[in-house]
């Protein structure tokens, strides 16, 4: 079954796919970052019965505009956010492999994961401000 056929049988049937290179499809869906940019989500067959959802490094690139992962603690927070959703970080790309019949739920879970990762800098500001008052 192709990725397009799998999407047709889910609530995501209104989503569109654009093939970016052979076997790699960009998901065109109404899923947006806080600034209005569309979340970059790519779908690839991982096996006959599973699909890889990934971002090809776009989430960490967005995060790097405002926030540096320059300490072991920040790296651990990032890794914890990703692993708590059952995903992995592969060469800068956040990846989640889901069974074909769980694609829609996987896309929704993945979009929440990307939102959490991209909002790490907000977490950092809140931690700094709360520590500021603790040290007064």
Per-region residue spans from a language model:
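Solvent-exposed, charged helical/coil patches
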Residues: 93-136
